[in-house]
Amino acid sequence: MTVYHFVGIKGTGMSPLAQILHDNGYTVQGSDIEKFIFTQTALEKRNITILPFSAENIKPGMTVIAGNAFPDTHPEIEKAMSEGIPVIRYHKFLGDYMKKFTSVAVTGAHGKTSTTGLLAHVIQNAKPTSFLIGDGTGQGNENSEYFVFEACEYRRHFLSYQPDYAIMTNIDFDHPDYFSSIDDVFDAFQEMALQVNKGIIACGDDEHLPKIHANVPVVYYGTGEENDFQARNIVKSTEGTTFDVFVRNTFYDTFYIPAYGHHNVLNSLAVIALCHYEEIDSSIIKHALKSFGGVKRRFNEKQLGDQVLIDDYAHHPTEIKVTIEAARQKYPDREIVAVFQPHTFTRTQQFLDEFAESLSGADCVYLCDIFGSARENAGKLTIGDLQGKIHNAKLIEEDDTSVLKAHDKAVLIFMGAGDIQKYMRAYENVMA
């Protein structure tokens, strides 16, 4: 049997795919940078070998699965190609692999990871399920009926997939290094919609999704009257959120989620709609929604002295806004402090005013230096440009996080898609 070698095994899609293949009895290994990335923990638990990048890793008899961030000139990929060893890009491999199952793609500008995690949690309570979540979590099951996976619109990678179902959470302008406009983003989703085989579950409250055309039924969810699945009587508390669901104006059931913010009601509604469509009993859905513990790097809380620390992946103005709102729902009487690390110069430049506006929803703002991704390293923009647009915003360094101690009993939200976690760890060490 072939050995699957993953080039970039710590990637948020690559790591869970490696886990799935391992769980199904395949021999898996991979290579990546040596710096710790949170996605490697699940690999280490399975004793999957992680090697430093080297052309020497490539051996005859392997199948190489290449991460999308790595060009054909990468030493490992180059060696495999020169020696006739099969090289398959991540999204192409995934597109072929899912054909064995009833597949559900979860896509959208925001909410993909949380909704994928929630759907996987709920549906596996009813039927054997394999899943691939963009927080680095994967699970394979040889007897799976369903394959639930996160599908990213970046560089139109999701067009490699022809899923049975697609959940579309929203359309928004992001990835300005690739997409030219909101219309360009919409066109990508429209193209994706035409590749779905059985049905689309889409948010009808979204400005753009109601314009989607498809060759399969499109079921809409949201709070608006025109939706097929409508959440009504939403009650938010410090314990979570309760809401009634009406299916085409007929009462279906009442649901409780231990989660905060309007976006989590919509994510749950998408899952309820898909499960209803697949005739999963509402009692199973209700029970599973109650017990969902969330996904990695999405509103992950910990107590530190009299402060609450929250780690969140929010890196777009829309995500920052809803994360701050969720914190206010759970902690209405506490000071909310945002510690934000912008991710990529192109995104920061594109959304400078929007970042300033969304961060202003916090009581106090600290800014970390801009994190350049693997796709870019420098820009003319500096963090000072964003600081100048936010009243009283302060800059924070990894080696001087002690200023956060001044916020007695506050909720500190560390947000970003780069390495914002090192700032949170540094602060925890200061407080130890």
From Swiss-Prot:
Its EC number is 6.3.2.8. Keywords: ATP-binding, Cell cycle, Cell division, Cell shape, Cell wall biogenesis/degradation, Cytoplasm, Ligase, Nucleotide-binding, Peptidoglycan synthesis. ATP binds at G108, A109, H110, G111, K112, T113, S114. GO terms for cellular component: cytoplasm. GO terms for molecular function: ATP binding; UDP-N-acetylmuramate-L-alanine ligase activity. InterPro entries: Mur-like_cat_sf (IPR036565), Mur_ligase_C (IPR004101), Mur_ligase_C_dom_sf (IPR036615), Mur_ligase_cen (IPR013221), Mur_ligase_N (IPR000713), MurCDEF_pg_biosynth (IPR050061), UDP-N-AcMur_Ala_ligase_MurC (IPR005758). The keyword ATP-binding applies. Pfam families: Mur_ligase, Mur_ligase_C, Mur_ligase_M. It is found in: Cytoplasm. It catalyses: UDP-N-acetyl-alpha-D-muramate + L-alanine + ATP = UDP-N-acetyl-alpha-D-muramoyl-L-alanine + ADP + phosphate + H(+). Disulfide bonds: none annotated. Gene3D superfamilies: Mur ligase, C-terminal domain, Mur-like, catalytic domain, NAD(P)-binding Rossmann-like Domain. One of its GO terms (biological process) is cell division. Pathway: Cell wall biogenesis; peptidoglycan biosynthesis. It comes from the Bacteria. NCBIfam families: murC. Belongs to the MurCDEF family. Cell wall formation. HAMAP family: MurC (MF_00046). This is UDP-N-acetylmuramate--L-alanine ligase. The gene is murC.
